[in-house]
UniProtKB/Swiss-Prot annotation:
Self-association and partners: Interacts with the ELOC-ELOB/Elongin BC complex. Part of an E3 ubiquitin ligase complex including ZER1, CUL2 and Elongin BC.
Family under the similarity heading: Belongs to the zyg-11 family.
Swiss-Prot/TrEMBL LRR repeat ranges: 226-245, 246-268, 278-302
General function of this protein: Serves as substrate adapter subunit in the E3 ubiquitin ligase complex ZYG11B-CUL2-Elongin BC. Acts redudantly with ZYG11B to target substrates bearing N-terminal glycine degrons for proteasomal degradation. Involved in the clearance of proteolytic fragments generated by caspase cleavage during apoptosis since N-terminal glycine degrons are strongly enriched at caspase cleavage sites. Also important in the quality control of protein N-myristoylation in which N-terminal glycine degrons are conditionally exposed after a failure of N-myristoylation.
Gene Ontology CC: Cul2-RING ubiquitin ligase complex
Keyword Hydrolase (UniProt): no
Entries under SMART domains matching the protein: ARM
Record protein name field: Protein zer-1 homolog
Classification of source organism: Eukaryota, Metazoa, Chordata, Craniata, Vertebrata
Record GO biological process: positive regulation of proteasomal ubiquitin-dependent protein catabolic process; protein quality control for misfolded or incompletely synthesized proteins
Length: 766
């Protein structure tokens, strides 16, 4: 099972400081600009962590607000020292790098920072004397500067500008630079001249860059240990250059087989060259390549027995010449991954769960197009088979969703995989901490990607969690998201149905403060709009029934929500639904349950005192819908109205006495052993009807309700009745002159039931 170990003190302090910057590390100058407190000095370990966690929070936590001048906290290396920072996405702009230009950075990773322009190239020079590792992956605009010549016009722009490619920048002066990633740069950046000043490169990533002449790579043949040429259109000339790089330990010439057509085919001869010439090779990625058949032995020829990673037994013929198994071999979407004997400790591929997880792990950061397809394979494994490495799978999917929250394919496949990876079959293997991470990443997806499939998958995944208890730590956020999804203009019925179900569950077992807060978010109004839309369409489906059920739950002992229901035309919708759907029993039960909550609020009862409403409630006393539920709830509504006394009876028809008689008749017709579709959290609204003589029928209804519940569900309701002080009130009824004899008899039976229960469950242990 996953560990539930608490967060480290460092992690908690870092998070707190970042969420309270102007109250901890800094202060606001001119109400806008952050400045570090003058008495603070932070070492590089803390500064690096603050920056990297800040980036993580901005990109992964939608409830975290970035601060425009955050990086100004680190402008002075005498008080704050940065050495290794990883920045990503649109969070980072030119002025942010400019703010930290005095720092002696050793490692700077900029990933998909598309807002960086050529201004940042000049800032990079500030780090040239210390920088060892640099990544500009996906920073597609960093080699552009903006100009606004008179001849450049664009009627759609307020300030027309032209982007001009900077061609004179080189890495001159970056004498310590060893690791460089230029992946996903634009094609016409002059790579050769750009890199020429670097004398001792050890690692180079040119993913997605097309160059017909790779001869310039040989200048690092004695130093280059890692070369990534993902999605480069290779030729035999490229291969001739690569095999001269005899120090290589990691070579990646993989490609995305769906992105475009590549003429180059991997042959047995090419693989043999790699093995012969690159004697230090430990990692090779040839994913996505078309492999000619002569590279492997046939299934018939493969040695029987246990799978082996020994090169001598390799099913891939050229790899039999390896001196030792590879640490990693990338074979995703490559037919070789399905062979039996592969000489590598770790293989990415699509043959089985292990290979698929290796693929997700290897490609998540920089190759979302590959990762989404790997996650789709994991989805099939979790759906059809059983996931044997659940915790690893969950963590990898969470990481991918965090890393690519605006990538549709990742969000669709990732949210679908999470649905299967969090179902009840795997529940015992997951810690509270891990399940909370899933919830947060699901909510991030719902918040940042307004797409039907993603929203549906996320809602379905939330259904796998205990509601409301597992969602309580994000309670407000969940409700806000669900209410936004339930905008009636949306046409997707399946999402509406799931979202209403979730809303209903979220307000079913929470305290009144939560219900009031959700009511103020627009919960009541949203449900009423859904009901109104269904009425117009003359449809009574699960959305309609769940909406009334949700209103029943959210109005329970919550007067403000009850008032909101009345103010927003709730009673008209009740009457219209009753008329339009006379045979829908569950609908009637939910509506009457809700009106029972409204009737419990003394200040609102006058609004129910109309001839039309009283007649409807009286007629429903004779309803046999859903057992006794509709009749019982109608009688409950009338019992609270009767409790206000004859002087509050403001209608001529029907007469109070006539309604009383119908209530007595209804109560006498009910089976005391009826099993109930109801859940009382408190008896307080019922108990307040006991100590009074103004309405004996209300007193009788309340006593009958208690008798039924303690008889059928003694374990639940006997303790509740005793706890809430019901026993003395029942004893008082027996002494009351105004109480009916049958009411007194019923009160005795309730007391007897609870007394027997108390004796049977008395703890006699010493």
């Amino acid at each position: 099972m996953a560990s539930d170990t608490p967060e480290s003190l460092m992690a908690l302090c870092t998070d707190f400081c970042l969420r309270n910057l102007d109250g901890t590390l800094g202060y606001l100058l001119d109400k806008e600009t952050l400045r570090l407190h003058p008495d603070i000095f932070l070492p590089s370990e803390i500064c690096d962590r603050l920056v990297n966690e800040y980036v993580e929070l901005v990109n992964a936590a939608c409830n975290f607000e970035p601060h425009e001048s955050f990086f100004s906290l680190f402008s002075d290396p005498r008080s704050t020292r940065l050495t290794r920072i990883h920045l990503r996405e649109d969070l980072v702009q030119d002025q942010d790098l400019e703010a930290i230009r005095k720092q002696d950075l050793v490692e700077l990773y900029l990933t998909n920072c598309e807002k960086l322009s050529a201004k940042s190239l000049q800032t990079l020079r500030s780090f040239s004397h210390t920088l060892v590792s640099l990544s500009l992956f996906g920073c597609t605009n960093i080699f552009y500067e903006e100009e606004n010549p008179g001849g450049c016009e664009d009627e759609y722009l307020v300030n027309p500008t032209c982007q001009v490619l900077v061609k004179d920048f080189t890495f001159e002066g970056f004498s310590r630079l060893r690791f460089l990633n230029l992946g996903r740069m634009i094609d016409w950046v002059p790579v050769e001249s750009l890199l020429r000043p670097l004398n001792s490169l050890a690692a180079l990533d040119l993913s997605g860059i097309q160059t017909s002449d790779a001869a310039f790579l040989t200048q690092w043949k004695d130093s280059l240990v890692s070369l990534v040429l993902y999605n480069m259109d290779l030729s035999d000339d490229h291969i001739r250059v690569i095999v001269q790089l005899h120090k290589l330990r990691h070579l990646d010439i993989s490609r995305d087989r769906l992105s475009s057509y590549y003429k180059f085919k991997l042959t047995r001869e090419v693989l043999s060259l790699f093995v012969q010439k690159l004697g230090n090779l430990m990692s090779l990625d040839i994913s996505g390549h078309m492999i000619l058949e002569n590279c492997s032995i046939s299934k018939m020829e493969e040695e029987a027995g246990q799978t082996s990673i020994e090169p001598s037994k390799s099913s891939i013929i050229p790899f039999r010449a390896l001196k030792r198994p590879l640490q990693f071999l990338g074979l995703f979407e490559n037919s070789l991954c399905r062979l039996t004997h592969i000489p590598a400790y770790k293989v990415s591929g699509d043959k089985n769960e292990e290979q698929v997880l290796n693929a997700i792990e290897a490609y998540t950061e920089h190759r979302p197009e590959i990762t989404s397809r790997a996650i789709n394979l994991l989805f099939d494994i979790a759906r059809i088979e059983r996931c044997n490495q659940l915790l690893r799978a969950l963590k990898l999917v969470i990481t991918a969703l965090k890393c690519h929250k605006y990538d549709r394919n990742i969000q669709v496949t990732g949210s679908a995989a999470l649905f299967y990876l969090t179902n009840s079959e795997y529940r015992s293997e997951q810690s509270v901490k891990l399940r909370r991470q899933v919830i947060q990443v699901v909510l991030n997806g719902m918040e940042s990607y307004q797409e039907v499939t993603v929203q549906r998958n996320c809602c379905l995944t939330l259904c796998n969690f205990g509601i409301p208890e597992e969602l309580e730590f994000q309670y407000r956020r969940v409700n806000e998201l669900l209410l936004s999804i339930l905008n009636p203009t949306r046409q997707d019925e399946s999402i509406q149905r799931i979202a209403v179900h979730l809303c209903n569950a979220l307000v079913c077992q929470v305290d009144n403060d939560h219900k009031e807060a959700v009511g103020k978010m627009g919960f009541v109004v949203t449900m009423l709009k859904l009901i109104q839309k269904k009425l117009l369409d003359k449809i009574c489906d699960q959305v309609m029934e769940f909406s009334w059920s949700a209103l029943w739950n959210i109005t329970d002992e919550t007067p403000d929500n009850c008032e909101m229901f009345l103010n927003f035309n709730g009673m008209k919708l009740f009457l219209d639904c009753l008329k339009e759907f006379p045979e829908k029993q569950e609908l009637h039960r939910n509506m009457l349950g809700l009106l029972g909550n409204v009737a419990e609020v003394k200040e609102l009862r006058p609004q129910l005192m109309t001839s039309q409403f009283i007649s409807v409630f009286s007629n429903l006393l004779e309803s046999k819908a859903d057992g006794i539920e509709v009749s019982y709830n109608a009688c409950g509504v009338l019992s609270h109205i009767m409790f206000d006394g004859p002087e509050a009876w403001g209608v001529c028809e029907p007469q109070r006495e006539e309604v009383e008689e119908r209530m007595w008749a209804a109560i006498q017709s009910w089976d005391i052993n009826s099993r109930r579709n109801i859940n009382y959290r408190s008896f307080e609204p019922i108990l307040r009807l006991l100590p009074q003589g103004i309405s004996p029928v209300s007193q009788h209804w309340a006593t009958w309700a208690l008798y039924n519940l303690v008889s059928v569900y003694p374990d639940k309701y006997c303790p509740l009745l005793i706890k809430e002080g019901g026993m003395p009130l029942l004893r008082d009824i027996i002494k009351m002159a105004t109480a009916r004899q049958e009411t007194k008899e019923m009160a005795r039976k309730v007391i007897e039931h609870c007394s027997n229960f108390k004796e049977e469950n008395m703890d006699t242990s010493r």
